[in-house]
């Protein structure tokens, strides 16, 4: 009878190098051929789960208290097995009776009825010894144990890699990467196995080699053939148009694999829009940069919460085809555009929470980037960084209104603002936020960088509000880059809603703004809150001052910037923006070939 060994015994077991005799090897192979009984047991949860298939084909999922004695769990398994056997027997009897009835013969008793089936013997073995029934579940269900139900044996797998979530996008287009959304427990995507299939065209002859996976009975169908792609991401080609896709995947952790799963796309692959505004830009970004460079992207991707309003469809973007404003369509373009830049840093604005988790994370993670998110109200900011180049050290996000009201760092600024209560009220009503991530180089630990990302207040008459927000942002960035991490350089990305002629831009580039600047009265004299502002940074717009980064029917102008610290960084190259002809092919942005009303800024920076 197996019971929990003492600590000394456990140390002894761990110290012995396992060597299998021929008999043990045979036993090991037999165990490998067994059915699986999957146990999920997490210390932070009161219950464990047990999943296995009975001989009748039914699948059982049980939840048992971790602190429960094993005997109770085994008794419950026996009851379930008996019920399953009874159902099978009843089904057989029903079929037999129907067969007799159809032949016109009565079902006469030829003897006594068979005796009622007894509960099968259910035992749990570990190292070929039966586990005592008073051992608690948490200790009894060990990896490698054997569960026996009647004559059937199951290999117990405790906490194997498993998918907790697996989804394909609803809208799939030829030429655009398909990135499944994955939720993994006890595993990682890099150690998992993926295999893509596509439907056989209706009426097409099945190839001589179907290419179907022999390890999965569910794939033994002539309706599917292999695509030849065994990676997490699949990009359909024009030949796939009209066909659905299937993904077969097995979760792994580098040491073992868990139960496989498969899923099919809801809709067939559709034709893409042809040439997109970013296709030519991708010619400059075919490869990831070397370690001494930082390819940086700043992009307002247009939140779905704004794109789907009646005002957007009829007033802001009436020239845009309605289907091209739908998220299912736009996210294909966004994913392809962003992944094609092979960026090291990506700062995004107007990111819906669901878009971050369901679309951006799966797509960019598959290409080696990891992201953090900061919500504003209905949407927020996202910063992604290449994991092979950077690790995240800390985050220092703030809400401007909360920081102004409660953080001593902004006491002086708030006192100046309070001299005009009306202006103060307007500023403190705004929900704008600042996202700050401190990153460290994975190849040189002495290199750290402060990456800031923001989206300032949008209203055309909100110039003074943007000045206050920028002043608060630079004070907070100074605290992070000078006080918390002395001397680290700054990259400040965002949609600043300010053209190069505004006070905000003047303040950032020149280091100061006078109290008589016209933007202090941007919403009239009654809200004038003139003050002299300065900051200590030496900043430059890495992409210069393009004619526009936002192009809609009623406005175009430069609103987006990547500001860099000239003391530590320099610009290696700026990826050219789309030509004016490309931008206006469909009148303005967004369009069927461009997913946002803004244009991404992309540049390669270099450490000095």
From Swiss-Prot:
Which region of this protein is its transit peptide? 1-16
Q: What is its EC number?
A: 3.1.4.-, 3.1.13.4
Q: Which residues are modified to Phosphoserine?
A: 216
One GO cellular component assignment for this chain's record is: mitochondrial matrix
The region called Disordered is annotated at: 91-111
Q: What is its main location?
A: mitochondrion
Subcellular location(s) per record: Mitochondrion matrix
Cite the entry's keywords alphabetically. Exonuclease, Hydrolase, Magnesium, Metal-binding, Mitochondrion, mRNA processing, Nuclease, Phosphoprotein, Transit peptide
The UniProt annotation places Mg(2+) 1 binding at 350
* Gene Ontology BP terms: antiviral innate immune response; cellular response to dsRNA; cellular response to interferon-alpha; cellular response to type II interferon; mitochondrial mRNA catabolic process; mRNA processing; nuclear-transcribed mRNA catabolic process, deadenylation-dependent decay; positive regulation of viral genome replication
Task: Show the InterPro entries listed in the entry.
Answer: CCR4/nocturin_mRNA_transcr, Endo/exonu/phosph_ase_sf, Endo/exonuclease/phosphatase, PDE12-like_N
* Chain's role: Enzyme that cleaves 2',5'-phosphodiester bond linking adenosines of the 5'-triphosphorylated oligoadenylates, triphosphorylated oligoadenylates referred as 2-5A modulates the 2-5A system. Degrades triphosphorylated 2-5A to produce AMP and ATP. Also cleaves 3',5'-phosphodiester bond of oligoadenylates. Plays a role as a negative regulator of the 2-5A system that is one of the major pathways for antiviral and antitumor functions induced by interferons (IFNs). Suppression of this enzyme increases cellular 2-5A levels and decreases viral replication in cultured small-airway epithelial cells.
Task: Please state what the protein is called.
Answer: 2',5'-phosphodiesterase 12
Can you name the source organism? Rattus norvegicus
**What does the organism's lineage look like at the top?**
Eukaryota, Metazoa, Chordata, Craniata, Vertebrata
Supply the gene name.
Pde12
């Amino acid at each position: 009878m197996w019971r929990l060994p003492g600590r000394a015994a456990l140390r002894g077991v761990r110290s012995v190098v396992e060597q299998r005799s021929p008999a043990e090897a045979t036993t090991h192979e037999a165990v490998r051929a067994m059915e699986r009984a999957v146990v999920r047991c997490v210390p932070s949860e009161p219950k464990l789960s047990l999943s296995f298939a009975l001989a009748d084909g039914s699948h059982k999922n049980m939840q048992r208290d971790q602190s429960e004695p094993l005997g109770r769990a085994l008794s419950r398994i026996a009851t379930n097995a008996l019920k399953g056997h009874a159902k099978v027997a009843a089904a057989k009897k029903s079929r037999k009776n129907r067969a007799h009835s159809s032949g016109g013969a009565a079902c006469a008793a030829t003897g006594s009825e068979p005796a009622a089936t007894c509960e099968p013997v259910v035992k749990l073995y570990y190292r070929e010894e039966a586990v005592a029934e008073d051992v608690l579940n948490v200790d009894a269900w060990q990896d490698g144990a054997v569960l026996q139900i009647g004559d059937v044996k199951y290999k117990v797998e405790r906490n194997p890699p498993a998918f907790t979530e697996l989804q394909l996008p609803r809208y799939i287009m030829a030429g655009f990467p398909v990135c499944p959304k994955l939720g993994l427990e006890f595993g990682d995507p890099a150690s998992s196995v993926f295999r893509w299939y596509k439907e056989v065209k209706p009426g097409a002859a099945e190839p001589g080699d179907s290419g179907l996976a022999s390890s999965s009975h569910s794939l033994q169908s002539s309706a599917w053939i292999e695509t030849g792609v065994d990676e997490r991401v699949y990009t359909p080609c024009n030949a796939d148009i009209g066909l659905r896709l299937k993904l077969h995947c097995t979760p792994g952790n580098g040491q073992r694999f868990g139960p496989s799963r498969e899923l099919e796309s809801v809709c067939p692959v559709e034709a893409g829009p042809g040439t997109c505004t970013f296709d030519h830009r991708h010619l400059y970004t075919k490869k990831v940069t070397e370690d001494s460079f930082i390819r940086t992207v700043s992009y307002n991707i247009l939140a779905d919460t704004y794109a789907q309003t009646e005002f957007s469809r009829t007033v802001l973007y009436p020239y845009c085809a309605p289907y091209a404003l739908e998220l299912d369509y736009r996210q294909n373009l966004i994913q392809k555009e962003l992944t094609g830049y092979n960026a090291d840093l990506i700062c995004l604005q107007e990111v819906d929470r669901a878009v971050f988790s369901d679309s951006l994370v799966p797509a960019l993670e598959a290409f080696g980037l990891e992201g953090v998110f900061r919500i504003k109200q209905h949407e927020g900011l996202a910063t992604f960084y290449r994991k092979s180049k950077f690790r995240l050290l800390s985050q220092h996000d703030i809400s401007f209104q909360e920081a102004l009201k409660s953080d001593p760092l902004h006491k002086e600024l708030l006192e100046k603002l309070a001299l005009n209560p009306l202006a103060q009220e307007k500023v403190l009503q705004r929900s704008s936020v600042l996202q700050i991530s401190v990153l460290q180089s994975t190849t040189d630990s002495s290199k750290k960088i402060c990456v800031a990302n923001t989206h300032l207040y949008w209203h055309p008459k909100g110039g003074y509000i943007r000045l206050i927000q920028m002043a608060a942002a630079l004070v907070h960035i100074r605290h992070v880059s000078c006080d918390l991490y002395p001397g680290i350089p700054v990259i400040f990305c965002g949609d600043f809603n300010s053209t190069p002629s505004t006070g905000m831009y003047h303040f950032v580039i020149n280091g100061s703004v006078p109290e008589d600047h016209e933007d202090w009265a941007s919403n009239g004299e009654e809200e004038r809150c003139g003050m002299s502002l300065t900051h200590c940074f030496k900043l430059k717009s890495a992409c210069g001052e393009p004619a526009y980064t936002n192009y809609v029917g009623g406005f175009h102008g430069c609103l987006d910037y990547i500001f860099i610290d000239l003391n530590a960084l320099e610009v290696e190259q700026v990826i050219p923006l789309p030509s004016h002809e490309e931008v206006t092919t469909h009148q303005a942005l967004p369009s069927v070939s461009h997913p946002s009303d803004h244009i991404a800024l992309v540049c390669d920076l270099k450490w000095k």
